[in-house]
């Protein structure tokens, strides 16, 4: 049996496209990573659908925790091992075989669920394979989520429940257990984890107030004073069967006496069934609960808080319940060693019920009350009690008689408005009505939770099919750009969806009103108002309602929402845009006269990169991620949020749009572009190249002037007269100290644009303007402690003319550009990591500009044979300017890396503002020569016409 047939047998499903399944289990396959990326979103949505349907009353945080446990790499890796999928993987890296084998052996020894992972970390390849297979199934069943779940459901068992998560030891116990096992202590799973922790901690019982008898008698009861029936406005007949649950103390426990169990019972006061009758239809919504026993384990160890009583009072105050009533139930022991047992009672008015619980035996009354309060808090936080409370509260929130908004004319008009915006008519309009009314109801939170994941999958599917050759990292960037919170909030405002919600939107907060006001003005990508969460949730909730109404059809969901979310960003859109957070950050700081600085470090534990933002040497924010550019982006976003709160600003205007503003520095002034005396004064711009990402960010510093001066005091307007510029020194700072870049590699990186004579470029024929282009050099500072003068030798980027480097000017139009020397300074605190395929990118740039292919050559080889370093150079010939650009790269251990290094420096040089100006000016000569020839031809034709006319007149005379 081959691998494909074996996987089909495990899934109990025969694939139509067996070739795709072969790709899904082959690590070196070009489709493997793409399928894994697709499958991750698919399984997340499948579990989201299941969890929301099974646990309709859980809060969003609980839903997220439950989904995270079920879609984690640890869970998926265990599924692969338990179903022997790892035997059929075609792995590329032999070292993975050992990791998979060790993990499989560890999983075989596990007896209980381990949502947080076991002792051996799961190899990611196992989880990736399961996700890849899931994507293959999803494609094979024509993108049907329901059919996928039917096939995968048995494979994904056991599905973790809220109780499974509650039974897991807290992180301190889990960490302690793993630490003990690492040093040779007993290594078992399940409840013995807590036992091991107990034994170790009890050695220090002098410093911990822990008694084994604390576990006795944990019980509470919920007493309802009258029977109740629950109503719902749902039009669909839904039947979920759950059972009555009882929490019973195990009487066989050696440390628990039978009388301790008496009356300590949690019971729901219905013997068999809890029926929920709908008020609008006769469809019964029935929950059947089977009896379950909850046994108190004597080895279960907990350390109770010192102020549990105060915390319980705070919970009651927050929920607007009466204060809890504490009382002493009994006193035990002799007078010199008394023992107290306390009880607490909580009355919840809106369900007309009472929670009552007895606590542990303690030597002091205060300790007994704190212990009791601790157990009551744990009980209130349990999923069972949350279910009971939410169900008991449902009649008042869902009772149609008490909620006239559901049938008001305002509600009907709101439903019609939303349907008109979506261009979609709901089958179940009650679903939309509930959404428009209840912001904090479980239904609203469930719709929001489902909608967010469904939209993400819809875009993932769209991008997967639209870009068949795109790598997962690029697909992820595109998906995030199209499903980000900013975009959701903008859609909610622009399309007017937020105006249709009646009860969902509370009194607008300042952030919401500011965002809506800003969106009412013309769009500005450099705003600093963060998207309010309430607006994001509204759109996600609408998406969830549509997704359920179209019967979980992802494709139909995208068809409905695509018009709202236009424009759909493409990869070209993202490449053309500067990274907005950096631009916003620098402009926000510059507006207030501040200077922004990024500093970098490593997290020793996780080995992640940390980026920190400083403003005038004062720490503002930080970001942490595996990639340094991601960490920097996170830090910039956090800094923008913090600075925008303390720096009142409505918009950050793009610097290029400041046409009508007058800026004065000294005696110079910048007048509007509509006046003739034109003197423009701008601040020096410092261009910083980031270490990892080669994106360019602009800092504006008030250090030097960039003036536009004319030869005469009066000139024509800008529309008639292209003006020359005199550019003062601009520093371009690159990263120097990088874990992947050696110090000697950055020595002597320089290039110069060489011209044998002063180049004069004719600019316009109407105005006497002369631009003189002087020689420019970008040189490493020789006084730097890491740069030796000899290192600059031969490392030259030069633009040399093959025939003539002197550009002629027109005698009647002397216009001169003067450019001063610029220094490129290497910043030792900014690391730089070169990409892997810069050589290919350089070839693409040359092809795009219709230049000949770049020529790579090995310039020198350094070091000994076992530690050899290679230096490569690259040369580009640009025919239309009759010039050649030449640059050397860094010393690298392999020829491929050396070529990529030289290509990287060439690309950065070509993208710099100075080089763009030089190439443009050099190309301008050819264009201007053509214009001059055309003008001369026109003048010649005019002369000929005049001559002909004069000849004709003479003949007539």
From Swiss-Prot:
Official protein name in the record: Ribonuclease 3-like protein 3
Keyword match Zinc: no
Superkingdom of this protein's organism: Eukaryota
Biological role stated in the UniProt entry: Ribonuclease that cleaves double-stranded RNA (dsRNA).
Highest classification ranks of the organism: Eukaryota, Viridiplantae, Streptophyta, Embryophyta, Tracheophyta
Annotated RNase III domain residues: 4-142, 415-551
A Gene Ontology biological process term: RNA processing
Ranges of residues in domain DRBM: 307-382, 566-645, 837-912
